């Protein structure tokens, strides 16, 4: 076999190359005619054969050379050990053999651990997962960081390896650790556009509010890299299941993460009913209560539902009619941001009236949705505490949240009233200005009507929350 035929294979030392014949991983002609190596070859020749056997992945020859006296932790050029090289190419069989022969799974070279090397390897996720699992079984530290303060979970999240991320967390990896730039595993997944990783990390307790050194949250990183689906996902309200896996034991978490689809149908760790979660309220408000069981069986959260594509809807058994309702509701939820801070002073004074009116209309519609949601919850609440069959938290928790809601609604009502007074003041000044050309009466009437509706909706929402608060206090 010619030497040039195999030069495309990875080399140790992070892919650095060398034209020197003394390269630690140089691949030359491997003589297979003499494999009875017990003391017949000089030690240097054995080492050379060992390097070449490692490079081409010849497991049987590696074992034979180890039997002949080659050290399993011998270091080659760039200071890499055989185990580090095997991990870098995701050769799970070689990793297993070397570990069984006593190779050090915690070896580091220039702050580069073998576990980090495995998580950033070029190979299929299946092989990388096997290598990581083997290393973790030999007590490799899942939180060891490289020179850039990146941990194994960050590399796995960056490269899109969902199962590897989950396995690392199951063995104690910290989800919210930040690297030298302030990136977390969630930030890396958002940057690279790995939606499944983002969902898994949120489920495992990732904090989506942590900022990078330049003050960017994961959602902003996703938006900057044009991953709009992930941006919407991270911008949406909290997921009822967010962080639930953190409460499980290591064994339960591994079972949850690595089970097959058939196992999930038999063993629902999250099958217990969460009363009036975001998903239930959302579906109830759209008249889609019949979808609740279907979505729960498939472990689909509200966050996931609202970021689905059309093919995902169909794949999960959601009819086209129901799809249209969900998409219409999602469109209504997307209130466009008006970036006043990015506008010049002249532009601020001439901000589009249509945009401002559209903002008020959407705000009013949002208030209407909130009122409907609270009405539905009040309707579904049991009349007395004896009818509550499932375990609830202390009612004090509910009433305290209701009190905060009432306060927030009162604050919102106050701000809307200020806005209304300001607009009324501007309107009066314009009417009294002799140089002003009077607009059609219908426009001012319509604007006033919208503001009145918004104020009424806010006050009505506050009244409903007050009733809800009294209901909880009575119980």
Curated annotation (Swiss-Prot):
<keyword id="KW-0469">Meiosis</keyword>
<dbReference type="InterPro" id="IPR002110">
    <property type="entry name" value="Ankyrin_rpt"/>
</dbReference>
<dbReference type="InterPro" id="IPR036770">
    <property type="entry name" value="Ankyrin_rpt-contain_sf"/>
</dbReference>
<feature type="repeat" description="ANK 2">
    <location>
        <begin position="78"/>
        <end position="107"/>
    </location>
</feature>
<keyword id="KW-0217">Developmental protein</keyword>
<feature type="domain" description="SAM">
    <location>
        <begin position="272"/>
        <end position="334"/>
    </location>
</feature>
<feature type="repeat" description="ANK 3">
    <location>
        <begin position="110"/>
        <end position="144"/>
    </location>
</feature>
<feature type="modified residue" description="Phosphoserine">
    <location>
        <position position="18"/>
    </location>
</feature>
<comment type="function">
    <text>Plays a central role during spermatogenesis by repressing transposable elements and preventing their mobilization, which is essential for the germline integrity. Acts via the piRNA metabolic process, which mediates the repression of transposable elements during meiosis by forming complexes composed of piRNAs and Piwi proteins and governs the methylation and subsequent repression of transposons. Its association with pi-bodies suggests a participation in the primary piRNAs metabolic process.</text>
</comment>
<keyword id="KW-0963">Cytoplasm</keyword>
<keyword id="KW-0677">Repeat</keyword>
<keyword id="KW-0943">RNA-mediated gene silencing</keyword>
<keyword id="KW-0221">Differentiation</keyword>
<dbReference type="InterPro" id="IPR013761">
    <property type="entry name" value="SAM/pointed_sf"/>
</dbReference>
<dbReference type="GO" id="GO:0031047">
    <property type="term" value="P:regulatory ncRNA-mediated gene silencing"/>
</dbReference>
<comment type="subunit">
    <text>Interacts with DDX4, PIWIL1, RANBP9 and TDRD1.</text>
</comment>
<protein>
    <recommendedName>
        <fullName>Ankyrin repeat, SAM and basic leucine zipper domain-containing protein 1</fullName>
    </recommendedName>
</protein>
<dbReference type="InterPro" id="IPR042650">
    <property type="entry name" value="Asz1_SAM"/>
</dbReference>
<dbReference type="Pfam" id="PF00023">
    <property type="entry name" value="Ank"/>
</dbReference>
<keyword id="KW-0744">Spermatogenesis</keyword>
<dbReference type="InterPro" id="IPR001660">
    <property type="entry name" value="SAM"/>
</dbReference>
<dbReference type="Pfam" id="PF07647">
    <property type="entry name" value="SAM_2"/>
</dbReference>
<dbReference type="Pfam" id="PF12796">
    <property type="entry name" value="Ank_2"/>
</dbReference>
<feature type="modified residue" description="Phosphoserine">
    <location>
        <position position="17"/>
    </location>
</feature>
<feature type="region of interest" description="Disordered">
    <location>
        <begin position="1"/>
        <end position="25"/>
    </location>
</feature>
<feature type="repeat" description="ANK 1">
    <location>
        <begin position="45"/>
        <end position="74"/>
    </location>
</feature>
<feature type="repeat" description="ANK 4">
    <location>
        <begin position="148"/>
        <end position="177"/>
    </location>
</feature>
<keyword id="KW-0040">ANK repeat</keyword>
<dbReference type="GO" id="GO:0007283">
    <property type="term" value="P:spermatogenesis"/>
</dbReference>
<dbReference type="GO" id="GO:0010526">
    <property type="term" value="P:transposable element silencing"/>
</dbReference>
<dbReference type="GO" id="GO:0071546">
    <property type="term" value="C:pi-body"/>
</dbReference>
<keyword id="KW-0597">Phosphoprotein</keyword>
<dbReference type="GO" id="GO:0007140">
    <property type="term" value="P:male meiotic nuclear division"/>
</dbReference>
<dbReference type="GO" id="GO:0030154">
    <property type="term" value="P:cell differentiation"/>
</dbReference>
<feature type="repeat" description="ANK 6">
    <location>
        <begin position="214"/>
        <end position="243"/>
    </location>
</feature>
<feature type="modified residue" description="Phosphoserine">
    <location>
        <position position="20"/>
    </location>
</feature>
<feature type="repeat" description="ANK 5">
    <location>
        <begin position="181"/>
        <end position="210"/>
    </location>
</feature>
């Amino acid at each position: 076999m010619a030497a040039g035929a195999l030069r495309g294979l990875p080399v140790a030392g992070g892919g650095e190359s060398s034209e020197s014949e003394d390269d630690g991983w140089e691949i030359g002609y491997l003589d297979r005619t003499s494999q009875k190596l017990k003391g017949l070859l000089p030690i240097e020749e054995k080492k050379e054969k060992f390097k070449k056997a490692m490079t081409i992945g010849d497991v049987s020859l590696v074992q034979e050379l180890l039997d002949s006296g080659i050290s399993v932790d011998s270091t080659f050029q760039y200071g890499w050990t055989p185990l580090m090289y095997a991990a870098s190419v995701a050769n799970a069989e070689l990793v297993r053999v070397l570990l069984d022969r006593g190779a050090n799974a915690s070896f580091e070279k220039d702050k580069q651990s073998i576990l980090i090397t495995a998580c950033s390897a070029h190979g299929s996720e299946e092989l990388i997962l096997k290598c990581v699992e083997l290393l973790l079984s030999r007590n490799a530290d899942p939180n060891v960081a490289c020179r850039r303060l990146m941990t194994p979970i960050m590399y796995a999240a960056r490269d899109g390896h969902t199962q590897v991320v989950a396995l690392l967390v199951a063995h104690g990896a910290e989800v919210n650790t930040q690297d030298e730039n302030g990136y977390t595993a969630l930030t890396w997944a958002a940057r690279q556009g790995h939606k499944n990783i983002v969902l898994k990390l949120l489920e495992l307790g990732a904090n989506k509010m942590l900022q990078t050194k330049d003050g960017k949250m994961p959602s902003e990183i996703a938006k900057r890299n044009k991953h709009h689906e992930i941006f919407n996902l991270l911008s949406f309200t909290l997921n009822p299941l967010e962080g639930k896996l953190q409460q499980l034991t290591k064994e339960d978490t591994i079972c949850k993460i690595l089970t097959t689809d058939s196992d999930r149908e038999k063993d629902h760790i999250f099958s217990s009913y969460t009363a009036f979660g975001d998903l239930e309220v959302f579906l109830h408000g759209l008249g889609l209560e019949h979808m609740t069981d279907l979505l729960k069986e498939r472990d689909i959260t509200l966050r996931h539902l609202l970021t689905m594509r059309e093919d995902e809807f169909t794949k999960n058994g959601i009819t086209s009619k129901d799809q249209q309702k969900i998409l219409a509701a999602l469109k209504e939820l997307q209130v466009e941001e008006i970036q006043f801070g990015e506008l010049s002073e002249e532009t601020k004074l001439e901000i589009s009236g249509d945009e401002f009116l559209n903002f008020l209309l959407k705000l009013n519609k949002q208030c209407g949705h909130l009122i409907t949601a609270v009405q539905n919850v009040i309707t579904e609440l049991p009349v007395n505490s004896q009818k509550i069959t499932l375990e609830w938290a202390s009612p004090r928790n509910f009433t305290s949240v209701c009190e905060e809601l009432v306060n927030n609604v009162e604050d919102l009502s106050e701000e809307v009233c200020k806005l209304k007074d300001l607009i009324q003041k501007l309107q009066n000044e314009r009417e009294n200005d002799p140089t002003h050309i009077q607009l059609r009466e219908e426009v001012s009437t319509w604007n006033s009507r919208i503001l009145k509706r918004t104020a009424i909706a806010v006050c009505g929402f506050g009244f409903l929350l007050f009733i809800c608060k009294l209901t909880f206090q009575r119980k």
